[in-house]
Every structure is written in structure tokens, then in C-alpha cells.
Amino acid sequence: MSAIGIMACSISHDMRHSLTAIYANAELLERHDICASVRDDLLLEIQEAVLAMTERIDSLLQFGSNGRNNPLVHERVSLVVEKAVAAVKFHPDGRNVSITVGEFPPAKAVIDVRNLESAIYNLLLNACQAAARSTQVPEVKVHLAEVDERIYVTILDNGPGIPDSVRTTLFDPFVTAGKPNGTGLGLTLARRVAEEHGGSVCLEKSNRERTVFTLSLTKNRFLPLEDLKSGRAGFEICGNRSANCS
């Protein structure tokens, strides 16, 4: 099936699923014999369905966009990471996950704040969804490191690991293995944003106890789009760090 066909099927399935939940719960809310706690649960499910649809639409818009539309600023990367962590804690998939952060260095870089926050948020959300399937208390850890002219954001989860069958296509659009509520675009978009910042996203490690992703960027280098199209971005950053770099 073509990429357009896969995208159309994916959108149709996800939107129909969310709309069905909204419609069914709205019908139940019309009843006068349900207690307050059940009513609250139904309203929460509607909110989660709307959030899922909004995330799907936002991901598709970002996936289909050409170029960068946000201003570049010289900013502390730690502030962006902290905002992404705070945001994912409010997501339904992040509420019951223990998210801990290490001590962040005050490293600055020339960045697209909005897109970089979105990329880190996507990685965090994936980690939370994986950790939720752990047989232990679900945990996600975030570390930030500065090495010469590069900055690394590392995200660890204690989920069951990534299946070998999808590792070669992990960064392809619409790969949703183990994520029934995922858009299948999070890693694709995170990789694109990292490459725009002169870096990449790597799967450093994945087994039954831990999965580790690292997003890297270069402090003072923001690649022009023509360099990205040539396919040169990313490999020099992570090429020696992982066999699963993209």
C-alpha cells in the first residue's frame, strides 16, 4: 500500500475510534440515572478522545509541512526539556508514570523552541506508553548532557522493549507497534527536528528491562534545508553511539 493509502487508513481508523467514543459517551450522559463518579469518567473519556484527535491532526500538519516557520533563539535546552516533561505529565498516558529528571547543565543552543519541545515531548510520551506496560512500577528517566559542541537528551523507560521486527522501520511514518493509541509519527517528527538542529535520534538500547533513546543537537549549527535533503544530517552525530541511529 502507498504512503498516502496507509495515511488515509490510519486517519480513518483513529478518527472513527475517537468519534465513536465521544458519541457513545455523549449518549450515556443524557441519562439521568448515572452517578456523579460515572459522569466524571465519561467526561474524562470524551476529553481524552478529543485530545487524541487533536494530537493526530497536529502530527499530520507537522508531518506535511515544508520547512521551518518558527523563530530561532539562543536558549537553554534544559528549559525546553522541563516544559516537555511538565506537558507530558498532564497527558493521560503520563499521569501514572514516575518521571524523574537528572541535574541539567545550563547548556545553550540556537534552537526552534516549539519544534524541539514537540520532539522531546513525543519521545517522552512514547517512553510513558512503553513504561505503562512494565510489570514493575512504570518509570521514565530524563538526562541532559553537554559534550563539546553537542547536547544530548537521553530518555530511559522500563517498558518491555521494542520488538526486533520493527527496529529497522522504527523511524518510518505510521509505525505504531505496541502503541494502540499512538499516531505513528512521533519518532518520524522527532528525527526530522533533531536533524534540523544538526543532530539525530538514536535507539541506544532496548531489552526487556530498559529502552533508551537519545536526541542530539549541535549548539551553534542549524542546518539549511538543502543539507537535510542531501541526507547528510545526523550520521556524524550518532554514528558511533548506536547501531540503530537514524
Outline where the language-model segments fall.
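Conserved HAMP-HisKA connector
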Residues: M1-S12
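Conserved micro-motifs of the catalytic ATP-binding
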Residues: N66-N70, K108-I111, A177
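Conserved catalytic submotifs in the C-terminal HATPase_c
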Residues: N96-K108
